[in-house]
Amino acid sequence: MRDPVSSQYSSFLFWRMPIPELDLSELEGLGLSDTATYKVKDSSVGKMIGQATAADQEKNPEGDGLLEYSTFNFWRAPIASIHSFELDLL
């Protein structure tokens, strides 16, 4: 009798939906055809995959348009701006 715990059908990898492949033509339609700023493999330790190097950022001074909508920047509360006249009121 087969052990149900070690069965291939109880595996997470068996039941999860496969990740769809990216269509590069869709990325070009979104204006993201320049894939040079996205690194597939990075040898330096402590650096996130997909993070542009300093040399790449100098080549592209306007920056990546999607960095504004990263999960950290999108979900955090905005930094309050306090002007000098407001500080005088405190």
Curated annotation (Swiss-Prot):
Q: Does the keyword Phosphoprotein apply?
A: yes
Let me know which tissues express this protein, per UniProt.
Expressed in myoepithelial cells of normal breast tissue (at protein level). Highly expressed in thymus. Expressed in colon, small intestine, prostate and ovary. Not detected in peripheral blood lymphocytes and spleen.
Q: What is its main location?
A: nucleus
Modifications after synthesis and translation: Ubiquitinated, leading to degradation.
Which terms in the GO cellular component ontology are assigned? centrosome; cytosol; mitochondrion; nucleoplasm
UniProt subunit comment: Interacts with HSPA8 and LAMP2 isoform A; the interaction may target MLLT11 for degradation via chaperone-mediated autophagy. Interacts with TCF7.
The motif Nuclear export signal: which residues? 24-32
Q: Where in the cell is it found?
A: Nucleus; Cytoplasm; Cytoplasm, Cytoskeleton, Microtubule organizing center, Centrosome
Alphabetized, the UniProt keywords read: Chromosomal rearrangement, Cytoplasm, Cytoskeleton, Nucleus, Phosphoprotein, Proto-oncogene, Ubl conjugation
The protein's gene is named MLLT11
Name listed for the protein in its UniProt record: Protein AF1q
The record's disease note says:
A chromosomal aberration involving MLLT11 is found in acute leukemias. Translocation t(1;11)(q21;q23) with KMT2A/MLL1.
Entry's family note: Belongs to the MLLT11 family.
- Which PANTHER family would you find in this protein's record? PROTEIN AF1Q
